[in-house]
């Protein structure tokens, strides 16, 4: 018995059930045939209605395939973009790290410069302090040198003035007869005062018999200084007697053995040396000062004939005389004075 294969009554329905489904309105000639999921023959799946099973795996839609293809492409693009972004981020982080290192290095250099500046400031302050101390020391030394130089120049000026005045010493010197037909030795060879031992005197004192007066009873008494502006006194060197007369009164010429001076009373104008000028070399009063600024301005003072001829008892006893240079007694003690005071 022969079995004839009959075509199906509705071939379109058969192909619609088992054939490939159209995707849109495209050409279906290029569509691939369906394959069985269980690995069966293609013939039974495509043409035979008597296939062992009716379950067929549906073909994947083209849209899903296209979407998966696009997704894979986009994933690859995203992966490429992520790699480029990661590289850029890494490079940016490296750049920031490099900038941080540079900033730290600059901060370290700044701190080092600040420390050097602080050291330089301390050194400058120390140098300023040392300069100030040296300036004070130099000023002190300059003042001392000026004071010493002023005293030395004053001593030299005093020596020159004493040579010019040719004043005798306060102590009595025995008179020597001058040689015949020759000037006095004191006038030819004046006593030179050593410059190293020369000291500025507080006053120039000249002992004269004109200091005292005779009373009516004929007895000598020490009276007050003559109340006149000035007197001219002759001081004998070779034993000649001295005398005095008022200004404006004629008097005979003094002999060759003495000198004549214009003397003043104690306490008058310019009769005593200025202490301020002697200490510092300058006086704030200037020309208005009542005291002498140097030996050239110092005017002689008339004294008692026994002025400074006896030793002061207070000094001889070892005490301090309150009168100082104004004392009328001698403050220099000799061995003879000590011997006489002990007995």
Swiss-Prot record:
One of its Pfam families is: zf-CCCH
GO MF term set: DNA binding; mRNA binding; zinc ion binding
Start and end residues, zinc fingers (C3H1-type):
268-296, 306-334
Keyword check for Acyltransferase:
no
Keywords linked to the UniProt accession:
Coiled coil, DNA-binding, Metal-binding, Repeat, Zinc, Zinc-finger
Q: Which residues form a coiled coil?
A: 114-147
Judging by the UniProt lineage, the source's domain of life is Eukaryota
What is the protein name for this chain?
A: Zinc finger CCCH domain-containing protein 39
- KW Repeat (keyword) present: yes
